[in-house]
């Protein structure tokens, strides 16, 4: 899978996870999270794990 396609898939998963768990985030925050955690890592996670990782990511900032 190309980098762009993998990244787009990760962004879509993050958006879905955040929506499912009522977490607000801007596009810039989502992009920063995907860059930090890497798309291939995010694409291997369940939505609940993505939401938890995002919460931890924003708590660290």
Can you describe what each PLM-predicted range is?
Residues 1-27:
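N-terminal acidic leader/helix
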């Amino acid at each position: 899978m190309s980098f762009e396609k993998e990244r787009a898939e990760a962004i879509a998963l993050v958006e879905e996870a955040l929506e499912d768990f009522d977490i607000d985030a801007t596009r810039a925050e989502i992009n920063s999270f995907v860059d930090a955690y890497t798309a291939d890592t995010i694409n291997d996670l369940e939505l609940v794990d993505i939401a938890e990782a995002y919460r931890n990511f924003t708590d660290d900032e």
